[in-house]
Swiss-Prot record:
Catalysed reaction equations from the record: nicotinate beta-D-ribonucleotide + ATP + H(+) = deamido-NAD(+) + diphosphate
GO aspect biological process, one term: NAD biosynthetic process
Protein name per the record: Probable nicotinate-nucleotide adenylyltransferase
Pathway, per record: Cofactor biosynthesis; NAD(+) biosynthesis; deamido-NAD(+) from nicotinate D-ribonucleotide: step 1/1
Taxonomic source organism: Caulobacter sp. (strain K31)
EC number, as in UniProt: 2.7.7.18
InterPro entries (alphabetical): Cyt_trans-like, NadD/NMNAT, Rossmann-like_a/b/a_fold
Keywords, comma-separated and alphabetical: ATP-binding, NAD, Nucleotide-binding, Nucleotidyltransferase, Pyridine nucleotide biosynthesis, Transferase
HAMAP family referenced in this protein's UniProt entry, alphabetically: NaMN_adenylyltr
Annotated function: Catalyzes the reversible adenylation of nicotinate mononucleotide (NaMN) to nicotinic acid adenine dinucleotide (NaAD).
Molecular function GO terms recorded: ATP binding; nicotinate-nucleotide adenylyltransferase activity
Pfam family, one: CTP_transf_like
Phylogenetic lineage: Bacteria, Pseudomonadati, Pseudomonadota, Alphaproteobacteria, Caulobacterales
Family: Belongs to the NadD family.
């Protein structure tokens, strides 16, 4: 089984997140995409993070279609960091081929994540293009450090079969929805 793991705070979830998940599902030929709703992003203020139940409900509205699963696994595992979650999931499900999914905006700051180099060595990673993030993502410390492990987008369908480190940057139609912009509108409105 080929499973994409799409983690985030989804604060709030929006059509851009759905676009990333759906793009990954199709281009990577995944059987499932699990949206891992983080209890609290360690790089963001807890003051602006909505309650988990509210964010889970928001994700359920966007995670539509066969193979999309919404999970609070990180909360249940007591995991705050992606690297810890990946290690637990890989140990529990050794026959599953996992791929970490992220938007290009996340790759741009990936070097700030705890254990980011270990994440790259733990599972293949798929980066989906996001507006305004392409240059920052492609020149980010993570992209430079793992340039040798970047696969061409034409090989995306077999990325799940790769031995990490392996990653791909997928371009295509862009979706301009943004959690930051949505939060800003809600604050003003």
């Amino acid at each position: 089984m080929r499973v994409g793991l799409f983690g985030g705070s989804f604060n709030p979830a929006h059509e851009g997140h759905a676009h990333v998940a759906e793009t990954a599902m199709h281009r990577l030929k995944l059987d499932k995409v699990i949206w891992l709703v983080s209890p609290q992003n360690p790089l963001k203020s807890s003051h602006e993070t909505r309650p988990l139940a509210e964010r889970m409900a928001g994700v359920r509205r966007w995670a539509r279609g066969g193979g999309m699963i919404v999970s609070d696994a990180e909360t249940r595992l007591g995991s705050q960091y992606t690297i810890d979650t990946l290690r637990v999931l890989r140990a529990r499900y050794p026959g599953v081929k996992f791929v970490w999914i992220m938007g290009a905006d996340s790759l741009a700051t990936f070097h700030r994540w705890r254990g980011w180099t270990q994440i790259m060595r733990e599972v293949p990673v798929a980066v989906i293009s996001r507006p305004w993030a392409a240059l920052k993502a492609r020149t980010s410390p993570a992209a430079r450090r793992f340039a040798h492990a970047r696969w061409p987008s034409s090989a995306a369908a077999i990325l799940a079969d790769a031995t990490a480190p392996a990653w791909v940057y997928l371009t295509g139609p862009l979706n301009f929805a943004s959690s930051t912009a949505l939060r800003g509108r809600q604050t003003k409105g």
